[in-house]
């Protein structure tokens, strides 16, 4: 008879096979009421799952991440049930869990409208209130295909036909609705009470543009209404911070149909972009990197030798000239190897760090483009380190220190780290992989950093570490990476003369801290809601005169700051000073320097910040010193 071991180490003995729900009931009525699913020997299963042998068991509630995932999966089924109830001719396809929610794709004779979305959500609440039991059953493969065909659900039948023979076909039913699913699911629809449908979008069946366009309904679901309300509030704040809106409002950039996925930088936006580039250029210079520049258009033959043509040719922009095929480079690494290959290299030359603000282009699908976050033309703070196997750990350690310093300077303190190790298909010996993985792991552990292991998620050419920023809305952005490459230097003929006089192939470390500069501008803009710290602000201060009598003095003050290297302008328009203050505050200018007759006489300015606070009178020299200190410290106030 089964003995159940709980997470706290305690044991429960039963004299007969039991379900997970019965285990929960044996522990207490509160847990039985709260339980949604459970893990049996690590596998997530329904509460109806029978335990017939000794097992380790953990009950899952809405407070657990697993519980929220089960809720979202079950809410996707609830959505499909509501759609079928309201629109019987609609066909259901797939409905997975995604970050913060779920979606379900439907085939229907007409587009769903916002009014339809409201009706569907209302129907979902109605079905949830009925607390319909959710029941699992299995069915033979051919019988399941025939069952869904009899319902007119051709997509479901096609999905089952693609499932390998021998796999269990499980169905879940609630009320008069049945869906194909592995599960697990909540025990009844009454557990689903914190959800909202978000939007409708198009999606091709199986993600193939040659197939039918389906209608995708997105939704979100949470463990309780409080979490749902908090999420919706975060969405509202994210909407307010949307870099596309702020880009227009602050006159930073625009994009247009004639160049999809390409950025038209305006003067203010280009200042911001250049400040980031110049900062990273100093980082390169101060940390032993040599900056290079490589061609934008390179012959197909190089991409074939590097292996990129075989894997990425669909994502390349190509052209031809004089009977030769060319590609606009989608990445910089093969070109960096060409620079390395010029001249004989010795072990004394290593590590060799080559950096480039490399302009790259990738032919992303138009539907995937999203402002600055997903573009076709972008610039990377790209660098490649050529080193020996013995130097990997030290170079990775140096890079990690540098990355955290850079992120801190931009105002990011929370960084998530993932280490990805060898996949099944890979190049290089196990011995070399052992060394590389050990070097990355040791470098992380030596700094006391928390990190997650992703077994098998490394590239075919080597293991990697990924670094993701967490912004003020707790969103995670993967920006930094360092990847070990055993393949490309060999493919492209890179060698060095070792201490023994023989030629060896160097290891190549691909590394970036910010990634795409365009994307990083988008991240910064949303993180700060356009209120950039002084050192990054396109306009750092505006001098405002109250009347025409102070115009000449206002010009002199602005020029004094400009001569010290600050981006300061004078607004001498014949407008009320209150109007000018509001306008420049809305433009997120960090400092407003107001001058009236009193300030002219004293040789000072009255200082206001964009948050509306009055900081009193400052002499010009004192304020220049304040700006200098704040810029040097890269303070993130205001």
UniProtKB/Swiss-Prot annotation:
Zn(2+) binds at residues 333, 384, 510. Its EC number is 6.1.1.3. Belongs to the class-II aminoacyl-tRNA synthetase family. GO terms for biological process: threonyl-tRNA aminoacylation. Residues 1-61 form the TGS domain. GO terms for molecular function: ATP binding; metal ion binding; threonine-tRNA ligase activity; tRNA binding. This is Threonine--tRNA ligase. Catalyzes the attachment of threonine to tRNA(Thr) in a two-step reaction: L-threonine is first activated by ATP to form Thr-AMP and then transferred to the acceptor end of tRNA(Thr). Also edits incorrectly charged L-seryl-tRNA(Thr). Its cofactor is Zn(2+). It is found in: Cytoplasm. Residues 242-533 are annotated as: Catalytic. Binds 1 zinc ion per subunit. GO terms for cellular component: cytosol. InterPro entries: aa-tRNA-synt_IIb (IPR002314), aa-tRNA-synth_II (IPR006195), aa-tRNA-synth_II/BPL/LPL (IPR045864), Anticodon-bd (IPR004154), Anticodon-bd_dom_sf (IPR036621), Beta-grasp_dom_sf (IPR012675), TGS (IPR004095), TGS-like (IPR012676). Pfam families: HGTP_anticodon, TGS, tRNA-synt_2b, tRNA_SAD. HAMAP family: Thr_tRNA_synth (MF_00184). Its main location: cytoplasm. It catalyses: tRNA(Thr) + L-threonine + ATP = L-threonyl-tRNA(Thr) + AMP + diphosphate + H(+). Homodimer. Keywords: Aminoacyl-tRNA synthetase, ATP-binding, Cytoplasm, Ligase, Metal-binding, Nucleotide-binding, Protein biosynthesis, RNA-binding, tRNA-binding, Zinc. It is an enzyme of class 6 (ligase).
